[in-house]
Design a protein with these regions (language model features):
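Viral structural modules
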Residues: 1-238
């Protein structure tokens, strides 16, 4: 057989636009922002439910991107990928419920807070496509702010609360509560990975890209006395 009978070439008309240079395009990739463990035993979430406060600073990959700007305003799309620790898909039904900032969170798997007619819920089986929900802009301020010089609360601040310095209360986006649905306890340990994608993005005051390791989750401090270059030496490149 000749080459032309094995490889068929077609005319492709590529189209490009300035939309590929927008903030929406730059932030349009979903990134990991949280992970929830629902084990069968232990001290963390052993009762088949968990509350995850929305936090996009827990993983450096997403945090470095948002800290390219001082202020941002966006809607967030969350995708929940659930499986067992071995990656197996099991016949388990889950409920994901969004709890706005300040609203009461469920304190047990059978709490009546799960039956509220106010908070939106999504029910999905592990064999279904991953649950996906959108959360609108939630801040009482005009934008989320990634650089904040202050405490998250008013009043007296004791020394043991120093690690909270730099956490901005305007960035609170709410909580996702998840539970296994059923009258009896689930027999499967589960791991839920949460991915976030930003939509309708507006941003102000660009900043240099982060290239040093983080020290704390609440603020962007770095070790100024031990700065390390992140790139490899280019002296030997030929």
């Amino acid at each position: 057989a000749s080459d032309e009978s094995m490889i068929e070439t077609r005319c492709v008309l590529n189209s490009h636009s300035t939309a590929e240079t927008t903030l929406d395009s730059f932030f349009s990739r979903a990134g990991l922002v949280g992970e929830i463990d629902l084990p069968l035993e232990g001290t963390t979430n052993p009762n088949g439910y968990a509350n995850w406060d929305i936090d996009i600073t827990g993983y450096a990959q997403m945090r470095r991107k948002v800290e390219l700007f001082t202020y941002m305003r966006f809607d967030a799309e969350f995708t929940f990928v659930a499986c067992t620790p071995t990656g197996e898909v099991v016949p388990q039904l889950l409920q994901y419920m969004f709890v706005p900032p300040g609203a009461p969170k469920p304190d047990s798997r059978e709490s009546l807070a799960w039956q509220t007619a106010t908070n939106p819920s999504v029910f999905v089986k592990l064999s279904d496509p991953p649950a996906q929900v959108s959360v609108p802009f939630m801040s009482p301020a005009s934008a989320y702010q990634w650089f904040y010089d202050g405490y998250p609360t008013f009043g007296e601040h004791k020394q043991e609360k120093d690690l909270e310095y730099g956490a901005c209360p305007n960035n609170m986006m709410g909580t996702f509560s998840v539970r296994t649905v059923g009258t009896s306890k689930s027999k499967y340990p589960l791991v839920i990975r949460i991915y976030m994608r930003m939509k309708h993005v507006r941003a102000w005051i660009p900043r240099p890209m982060r290239n040093q390791n983080y020290l704390f989750k609440a603020n962007p401090n770095y070790a100024g006395n031990s700065i390390k270059p992140t790139g490899a030496s280019r002296a030997a490149i030929t």
